[in-house]
Each structure stands twice: as C-alpha cells, then as structure tokens.
C-alpha cells in the first residue's frame, strides 16, 4: 500500500491497483468509475479496465482512452458493485476493488474466484453491518411511499449519483419517478449498455412544465444533505419528504440522518456476513484487508483461523 494506491510486485511485473495518479509504466487497473478510484491516464503503461468504466469515467470528466479488457494472464471478474465494476485475478492473487455479492435489481452479485492471496475491501467489516434483504427493503420503502402518497406528499429517494441511484430507479420504477438531471445523465448511459431503466423527465424540465405542482410524485436524486439548496427548495416549495439510502444507516454509531426524513440501509458493498462468505468462497492462504474497518475485520478473520492482516502503506511488497 502506497500513497498512490496498492502496488503489487509480481515477478518482473509491477501492478498498480486503483492508483490515485497516472503511472508512467507498469500495469494499472481501474476497478470502477467512482471518483475515488479514477485518475487521468498518462504515460506508456498498460491500463486494464472495462469499457463501461471508461465510458462512465469520460462522462465524469476523466480521460481514459488507451485501455485493454484482456491482457496476458490478467482476468477481470465481475464485482457486482456498479455497472462495469471489476475485480482483478492474476498470479493467484484476487483484488476485489469495491465488491458486492448480493443481487440488487438488475445488478447481479460478484463472481468469486478461488485464489491464494485475497486483497479485499472491508468497508462494512464490522458485525453490526448486516443489511436487510432487498425484498424487505423494497417492501418497507413502498409502504412509506404509499403512506406519504396518501397524504399528498411528494417523495425524493436519495442515493449516490452513480450506482445506487440507478438501483433505486429500477426498484421503484413502478412509481414513474422523475430524475434529478445528474441522475438522468447516468441513467441514459446505463441504458446505452442495455440496463432496462425507464426513461423519464429530469427535474429541471419537470419543474419548468409545472409537473411538480401536481402532487404527489416521486423523484430519484443524488445523495444530498438536508442543507443542500436543491433539497431545501424541494421541501419549501413542494413539501417533499426525503428518504436517504446508505449502508451506514444500519448503525446507530453513524449519524447518516443528515437531515433526511427517513434513512434506509442499502449498499453497493458487501455487508459483514457477505464479506465472510466472500472469504470462504475464495479460500485463500493469505488475506489483506483494505478500505474500511481493516484492523477489525483482519482481527476477526485471524480469530477464525485465517492468515489475515490489514494492509498499511508499504506493507504489501514484503509478502507478494
């Protein structure tokens, strides 16, 4: 682990896993198109990424032009996180990137390969983070929306602009939602890749046509706090109710409320039990934990008999 992400030295090859900055040479892997995993490409090195990731990156203002989806003994593996998200398998090493093994609407859970060395994220690597089933979540949210509709209240579902907003668009399409303009742009790109998301108006057009005055209605918007000007406007003018979605909503230790009227646990990452299942399915000899509760999850795995350690800066090259 370095200040520029995870670097693995395997034989004569140098592999940069989700580097924060472009590298001049070696092999780089970009697992998915969330902003904390992207960088502008430069140099002569080989960059491995999915086509979906590169297209979403361009939409978000990043330049990834020269890339490969296949290279020698490197295999990308579906990570189930967002559209185009991949893990990387090479030399019996599996790097998960951000991963979810749970099916969520159109998003299918990750493919999990056997490996000798597992480098896994553990965003929710604490036992308190065990999420409700998708069916239970959808049922609960539909009940909330129905109750609010009965009172004539418009509802805004809030989730990350890339990934969760598309899951929400799919799961609650029967309410014929409007989309925040930024969500609409991402949804259109998802449709380009065959994801069956319903077309709808963006919020600017819907408001300009007076459609938001015809309450109740549903809207899918990016994750924003109650202090955001857009949310304050929607509440003051239309008396809208907000429902925020995040894995952090599972824990009372984290104040995910952020001024939302409701907070619902829903994540594009593995929960604690799913992380344990991931480890069992990989059946590795060595485990490195990255991103999240790295110390706690590694300690739990060690108690279960695994050879696990949190990945700190400059620690990985000593072992791989």
For each predicted feature, which ranges?
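A short, well-structured beta->alpha microelement
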Residues: 1-21, 67, 104, 192-217, ...
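Binuclear metal-ion centers of metallo-dependent hydrolases, dominated by the metallo-beta-lactamase
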Residues: 1-3, 111-112, 126-201, 206-211, ...
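C-terminal regulatory/interaction regions
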Residues: 2-3, 206-320
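His/Asp/Glu-rich metal-coordinating catalytic cores
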Residues: 2-23, 27, 33-156, 163, ...
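Short, well-ordered alpha-helical microsegments
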Residues: 38, 85, 103-104, 164-168, ...
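Short, conserved loop/helix-junction motifs that constitute active-site signature segments
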Residues: 41-43, 110-114, 172, 233-238, ...
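Short internal beta-strands
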Residues: 45-55, 119, 176-186, 244, ...
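Active-site-proximal loop/helix segment associated with metal-binding centers of metalloenzymes
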Residues: 81-91, 99, 103-104, 117-124, ...
